[in-house]
Amino acid sequence: MKETILEMERYAEENNIPIIEVDSIKFIMKYIKLNNVKSVLELGTAIGYSAILMANATSTVEITTIEKDEKRYREAVKNVNKCGLD
């Protein structure tokens, strides 16, 4: 999964796609763990970067994420699948 995350960061940089800042996602992942969060609704999937990382915060969290852009949606699905998530 780590390699996929690095690929996603490069892809986002090269294609001007906004993804969450590292400090922000670290905070959110810690919050999910400490508060035993069971579900998250994310609006704006982009390429799936934050959804994948949040899904890996704990084994019990369920992420629902919504993306209106068809191209980004397809890219996100591809990335989620590459990380073994669905």
Predicted regions, residues:
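A short alpha-helical cap/connector motif
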Residues: 1-86
